[in-house]
Design a protein with these regions (language model features):
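NTP-dependent nucleotidyl-transfer catalytic core
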Residues: 1-258
Length: 258
């Protein structure tokens, strides 16, 4: 859905205008129909995630707080930042959070973009919530290295606003990009970023063929464990902070570090 919506957003001005309106409605919970559609998508997404977690033997008992959880804190956080003279309106009519020695975070888009909030807005609300309400002393963001500047900005605002003190440890745990055999960003057969479930399925197909070639009988459970275990180990054996090639041929070698 996101891919189709992104394409329509980039190529259809009417769709783009509608998207700005719907986004603001979601953030303010001001349209029951819009919220109902989002709720349906959200539930289906969570169900899909849980299926992947189950395949990876990851607990489903997770405390999930997505962006929507923090919408109700936006006005409060805006007031806190305004009181500290950290918010201003730029030449384009956007509300921005001014940051020491770096570019600002856009807090609210301009009127021609629906006055909607950005993920920077909800990240600020999440940081405030985690540090002042949950009283978290350590906060880790496991996100790819391309977001390094964003988290530098985020943590600077947290410190300037007084949410992050010397007692807090906030860190961006950056990881590299997954590459294909050709050294380019890993993509599926249709040229898009692959889903983890697709990678697992491909691994299972590979192991199934490998056992068949060796005339080895194996249960579906064993095949699944070998495939998923190999994927996990291969990923964890690489340096977290650097890019690496994802190659089933190397991953399934019976010799070497596999």
């Amino acid at each position: 859905i996101y891919i189709l919506a992104r394409e329509a957003f980039d190529n259809n001005d009417d769709f783009k205008e509608c998207a700005y309106v719907r986004t603001k409605e979601l953030q303010e919970n001001s349209n029951e129909y819009t919220t109902a559609i989002w709720t349906s998508i959200y539930k289906n997404s969570i169900n899909a995630y849980n299926k992947v977690y189950a395949r990876l033997n990851i607990s489903e008992n997770l405390n999930v707080y997505g962006e929507s959880h923090y919408y109700k804190y936006i006005n409060h956080v805006e007031s806190l930042l305004t009181d500290k003279n950290m918010i201003s309106v730029d030449a384009e009519g956007r509300k921005i959070v001014n940051i020491t020695n770096t570019n600002p975070i856009i807090f609210e888009k301009s009127q021609d973009r629906g006055n909607s909030y950005t993920y920077g807005t909800t990240d600020l609300c999440a940081l405030w919530y985690r540090s002042t309400q949950l009283k978290c002393e350590e906060i880790y963001y496991v996100v790819d290295e391309g977001q390094s500047l964003h988290f530098k900005q985020l943590f600077t605002v947290g410190k300037d606003a007084g949410w992050l003190t010397e007692q807090h440890q906030s860190k961006h745990v950056a990881f590299g990009i997954l590459l294909g055999k050709d050294g380019k960003r890993l993509k599926s057969r249709d040229g898009r970023a692959p889903k983890l479930s697709d990678v697992i399925d491909e691994g299972i197909d590979y192991v199934t063929e490998m056992f068949a070639t060796k005339n080895t009988n194996a249960t579906d459970d064993k095949i699944s464990k070998v495939a998923i275990g190999s994927i996990k180990y291969y990923d964890l054996s690489k340096s977290r902070s650097t890019n690496y090639k994802f190659d089933f041929d190397n991953m399934m070698q019976s010799t070497g570090n596999t």
